[in-house]
Structures are given as structure tokens and as C-alpha cells.
Amino acid sequence: MSSPWIFISPSSRGIGHALTRHLLRTTSLPILASTRSSDPASTKSSLLKDLPQAEDIAPRLSIVQIDVTDESSVAAAADRARELFPSKTHHLRLACAIPGMLFPEKNPKQIDMEKALQTFQVNTLGPLVLMKHFAEMLPKQSVELEPSPKDDQLQLSNSHALWLNMAARVGSTSDNRAGGWYSYRASKAGVISLSKSLDRYLAARNGEKALAMAYHPGTVKTGLSKDFWDSVEDGKLFSPEDAAAKMASVMAGLKVDQRGKCWDWKNEEVLP
């Protein structure tokens, strides 16, 4: 029987930071989390700060350094994952690829090619390179999955693993009613597309043992959305902690017939 582990990239701030802390509190699974920082110990300390029984939790949290625009760092992190979680005894039960950045152009004249390229490198190619090096650690069809511990507050599926890529509602072409945000919209549309492609690959290779999805978290009170907090309607601006809890609930409840699609924090489908 294969033992589960969790991968969150990145985890040093925003939703990734809150999600890692949430999963440390609500599951007993080992977690591999990433940071761009050259001081992983500082990231680990931040993730554990003020958590109940932090000293007991600390051994199951490992930190790797990843810059998604530098494939060599992703490859090195994947090598470390294989050392910590050998494929003969372990499988990747939950992976969250959530790098993101935003340059909100209002019209074509504001498009800066260097910033647009950076947006695609982080938002679209970031999850893509994480998929390249980590998706093979998801369980194959023949693998018998060890159940989630019954005492865990968050019960991940015992029948399948899940790969999540962070998308956004503005990545929906069919829902594009306002225009603008050219590079960000296109980069997130790409995330929805590559999530579907990954799921098709997993369906052929892993059967129902591994699924992929894209996710829209709503507007979250992070540095990425800071300039737009005042324009969000009441009750729709989420703290990172609230967003993480909603995200975990959607992930834990995802069914096989929901695979390959983009879902939001209300567990409603976001059409491409």
C-alpha cells in the first residue's frame, strides 16, 4: 500500500502560505512546500508560527527552493521529493501549482512585452514545468492507495489523487464581458487549457487514480489583488485563510466526473 504526501508550490506568502498552514492543521500527511527564498528555514518557521503543536508538526514539513522561471530549480526539487518519498512506497496525493502575478493592462497600448512575457512564464509556464517534473509522482492505476487517517479533520479522497492548477475566472473566454487585463487573462486561459490536457494524459496513464483540475479562488486579500480591494462587493473579498479553507473543501470533495474542468470556491464550474 502506497503512502500519501502533499506538494504546494509556492508557499511563502498569500494563498499558498495559508493553504500550507491549513493542511498542516487539518491533515497529518507530510507536506513538501516550495519557496523562491534562499532561506528555506525562514519559510518553514513562518509556516509553523503559532500553529498548535508546531514542534510535533515540524518533522512532516519539508521546504524546497523553486523559481518556476528556472527549470533547473524545479528539477532539483523533484529529485529531493523522490529522496523523501520514494515511488515504491509513496505517491503524490495532492499537488497545488499556484504561482501567480498580475500586470493589469486596461488597453492594448499599456501592454509591456517584457512584463507580458514574465506573466506567461510565471502564470502558465510555471504550472507547466511543475507538471513536467512532479506529475509522474501521482499514483498509477495499479497503485493501492493508503487511506487518509480517520482522525484527520480534512478527509482527502481515498480513491484518487488530485493535481490542481491555479486559474482565475478572468481566464474564461466565454465569460469575458469586460475585456482588459490582456496578459493575465490569456495566461490564465492557458492554465485552464493545460489543466484539461494534463487530465486527459492522467486519464490514459493513471485511470481514475489521478485527476487534474483548474481552480478559481475568488478575490483574495493578497498583494496580487491589493489595488482592487475597494472595488470588490461586500462578502466577496476573502482573507487568505478563508480562501484556503474553501479551496481545501473543494479539493477534498472533487468527484471523478468533475475531472479536467475549472471549479470555483463555490464548487461551481467556470466554463472555458
Residue ranges and their predicted role:
Residues 100-102, 107-120, 125, 135-206:
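Catalytic loop of short-chain dehydrogenase/reductase
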Residues 9, 88-102, 123, 165, ...:
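Rossmann-fold scaffold of SDR-type NAD(P)-dependent oxidoreductases
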Residues 67-90:
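Conserved Rossmann-fold cofactor-binding substructure of NAD(P)-dependent oxidoreductases
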